[in-house]
A protein has these predicted regions:
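Acidic, polar-rich low-complexity tracts and alpha-helical solenoid repeat scaffolds
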Residues: 1-342
């Protein structure tokens, strides 16, 4: 084929691009494949050239570039043998890049078109659907998608002891997200009629969410691990923040009793900041070790710094109070029992 700017025929250009890819010169290979597609966008190698361009960008870590080309394959070549795999890869990238609304839309279209998806492809569809539904506050549909994904995982025995396949990370992350948003719907201001029951329910959901996020980390994917680690730290930090806003009870009717209540609350729940910092320390250390540089790592560093400052403020506030830890604990026990501390 002769063009205005090249005398290289398409098969030869395709071979050159393939050689570049095999030599791990992925960016160069991607550009050559894309040139082959551009020169002959309706030719016999058009769909494969565009797909290979996407794949080269994908392995080179250029996710947005890869995503746009996978999506283009699906749009331009819906009858191609590459359509199915292009859709699944686009789904994984949409989920990875947190484009959850688009991921949900593509998941529904893909599931409607292909009724015989393989297990891992089904997991890509279901995790994308679940995350899009969580983002839309649709608990019912999110839980349904996660349940179907977990059924596949169990049926195929995909989750054994230790490391799990990378395809499971978004499923478990979605489960963590669902449990997280349910936990954070439980508030303590105004003080609920049964404060103890509300706190117990939120703590249980927090622990359940942490368990799911921990399962996501078992894929040993630094991106998903950073996201999950940040979320766990955030769960503890937010719970502490909200508990510190709980107003003093009516029994705290003097300045001394209000000080006792404030100090007792700070003392009892300071452990939440310790747990948050521990998880964020772990997340930042993982990022340093693996070279992960996603926005979630920056958020983890910033959150850790904020928690260090909050911990110092808590310690200073406790030090200013003219009471021992034993006195504060006794006061909190009295308030919790509905009694007035002396």
């Amino acid at each position: 084929m002769v063009t205005a700017d090249s005398t290289t025929d398409i098969p030869e250009l395709f071979r050159q691009a393939t050689a570049q890819g095999q030599a791990k010169q992925y960016d160069s290979a991607a550009r050559l494949f894309e040139r082959a597609f551009t020169l002959d966008p309706d030719g016999p190698l058009a769909d494969k050239s565009l797909f290979e361009s996407a794949e080269m960008y994908d392995v080179d870590g250029k996710h947005e570039e890869a995503l746009s080309r996978y999506e283009q394959v699906a749009r331009r070549f819906p009858s191609s043998d590459l359509d199915r795999v292009a859709r699944v890869r686009a789904l994984r990238l949409l989920t990875y890049l947190e484009h959850y609304e688009r991921a949900g839309e593509l998941a529904d279209l893909t599931a409607a078109k292909y009724k015989d998806l393989l297990s891992f492809d089904q997991l890509a569809v279901l995790s994308a659907r679940a995350l899009s539904r969580v983002a839309a506050d649709d608990d019912t549909q999110a839980e349904l998608a996660i349940g179907k994904a977990r059924d596949i995982i169990e049926r195929e025995s995909l989750d054994g002891a230790g490391r799990v396949p990378a395809e499971l990370a978004p499923v478990y992350f979605a489960l963590g997200e669902l449990r997280r948003v349910r936990a954070e719907r439980i508030h303590f201001v105004p003080v609920p009629a049964s404060f103890g029951a509300a706190l117990e329910q939120r703590c249980q959901l927090l622990l359940d969410a942490q368990s799911a996020y921990s399962d996501a980390m078992r894929a040993y994917d630094s991106h998903w691990s950073a996201m999950a680690g940040y979320r766990v730290g955030e769960l503890y930090q937010k719970l502490h923040e909200e508990l510190m806003q709980v107003p003093a009870p009516k029994a705290a009717d003097t300045e001394r009793r209000r000080q006792l209540f404030e100090g007792a609350m700070r003392l009892r729940y300071s452990i939440l900041l310790d747990k948050a910092k521990s998880m964020l320390d772990h997340t930042v250390a993982m990022a340093d070790r693996t070279g992960e540089q996603s926005p979630w790592v920056l958020k983890s560093r910033q959150a850790r710094d904020a928690i260090i400052q909050a911990t110092q403020a808590e310690q200073a506030a406790l030090a200013r109070l003219p009471y021992t830890r034993e006195q504060l604990q006794a006061a909190l026990d009295s308030f919790s029992a509905g009694h007035v501390p002396p």
